[in-house]
Regions:
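Glycine/proline-rich active-site loop of Rossmann-fold NAD(P)-dependent oxidoreductases
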Residues: 196, 208-211, 223-250, 258-260, ...
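Pocket-edge positions in alpha/beta enzyme catalytic cores
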Residues: 75-76, 88, 118, 237-244, ...
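N-terminal Rossmann-like NAD(P)+-binding domain of SDR-like oxidoreductases, especially those catalyzing
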Residues: 1-224, 386
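Short-chain dehydrogenase/reductase
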Residues: 126, 130, 202, 249, ...
């Protein structure tokens, strides 16, 4: 069934390919974005390796190659509540996909200003969306892109379930009481903390106002292009490699392309969850097609397909490219070593066939990192954000 879908943050790394993918499937798409990610590029003086066109050119290119039109509104959902409310009433979306949050942990830890900006932006955006849906009195399915980081990255000694944990407690009289609760949050940055607070807002609005919500706890996204973004270079997706927004794998690929040692933080024993960008857009489609039933609790999916230790990723990239590996002090306040076992049965049960690093990593090396290598600013690769003063001093 074709749906009206409002995509908040539709100009960003995950939002743009999702917008194209769902538009290509025939859904009516309306993007709302204040272009904050482009403004952060200006602030950091670190742009995408790939050439990102102005929004108007992107939308015109999509119309030319697909015949589909995507509408666009430029405003800040964290600040302009009444514009959001009016738009929801006018557009009457079947679903709202919420990407409109500052997404980088290092950026959220750069300074007190960046911490406050991330909290104000992310929490206000989420609360405004929820409050507007309730005030509009429209049955809208909200799909939120969260993070695996809400669970934390300590070794749990068990497979992390999809959002909810069954616990047993001893009552006063000695009898055992069993409940199912949200998996205990253990954020590792201000950014991750905002995502854990999003969870509580979702739980409340779902319980109090019966808002139908799907929360996707996503792993680190790798890959740049999708079938849609490859259709015209004007549609190309972001490839961030800088120390604030570049994910660990992107940073390794960029370093290898310029013959720079792969910078592994600490021992490289940190285990993280990963997912390819093409699987991300497919997961969003699955979530859109399988909304919660009325009165159903918040539906939580673990949106990841594989886990790897950072040093193993470095070894894989080194074997593909011949790059050397360099171990450097870790700017983050995190465990040097951790295991990570994650349940992801929901998406696999809906037919997701994951793209793995073993399948597509070489393509990413050749098609993106080496092709656009001349656009690289090597001074932006090292991470310049420290989790605390102790970490900063250790780097000096």
């Amino acid at each position: 069934m074709k749906k009206r879908v409002m995509i908040l943050g539709g100009d960003g790394f995950c939002g743009w390919p999702t917008s194209l993918y769902l538009s290509g499937k025939g859904h009516e798409i309306l993007i709302v974005d204040n272009l904050s990610r482009r403004n952060i590029d200006n602030e950091l003086e670190a742009s995408s390796l790939t050439p990102i066109q102005p929004m108007g050119i992107r939308l015109q290119a999509w119309k030319e190659v697909s015949g589909q039109e995507i509408r666009f509104m430029n405003f800040d959902v964290s600040q302009h509540y009444h514009r959001l409310l009016t738009l929801i009433r006018e557009f009457r979306p079947d679903a709202i996909i919420h990407f409109a949050e500052q997404r980088a942990a290092p950026y959220s830890m750069k300074s007190s200003w960046h911490k406050r900006y991330t909290v104000n932006n992310n929490l206000n955006a989420t609360n405004n969306v929820l409050a507007a849906v309730v005030e509009a009195q429209i049955d809208v399915h909200i799909i939120h892109l969260g993070t695996m980081g809400v669970y934390g990255y300590g070794t749990a000694g068990m497979k992390i379930p999809e959002g909810y944990l069954k616990v047993k407690m001893e009552a006063d009289e000695g009898q055992t009481v069993e409940q199912e609760i949200l998996y205990p949050a253990n954020p590792g940055s201000i950014y991750h903390m905002t995502k854990t607070q999003d969870q509580l807002m979702f739980a409340f609005y779902n319980k109090n106002d019966r808002v139908r919500i799907t929360d996707l706890h996503q792993g680190i996204v790798w890959g740049t292009q999708t079938e849609n973004t490859r259709m015209d270079e004007r549609l190309i997706n972001r490839f961030d490699y800088d120390g604030d927004y570049g994910t660990v794998l992107n940073r390794f690929l960029m370093e290898a392309a310029i013959d720079y040692p792969l910078s592994v933080h600490g021992t490289g024993g940190q285990t993280r969850a990963f997912i390819n960008i093409q699987d991300t857009v497919r997961c969003l489609e699955i979530a859109l097609e399988s909304p919660p039933e009325p009165n159903e609790r918040v539906k939580i999916f673990n949106q990841m397909t594989e886990t790897h230790r950072v040093r193993d990723l470095a070894k894989l990239v080194s074997e593909l490219t011949g790059a050397k590996v360099d171990f450097i002090p870790n700017p983050r306040n995190e465990a040097d070593e951790n295991d990570l076992y994650v349940a992801n049965d929901s998406f696999l049960g809906h037919g997701l066939k994951p793209i793995t690093l073993a399948d597509n990593l070489l393509e990413e090396v050749v098609d993106i990192a080496r092709r656009y290598v001349d656009a690289c600013d090597t001074s932006k690769i090292p991470c310049s954000s420290y989790w605390n003063k102790e970490r900063e001093i250790s780097q000096q």
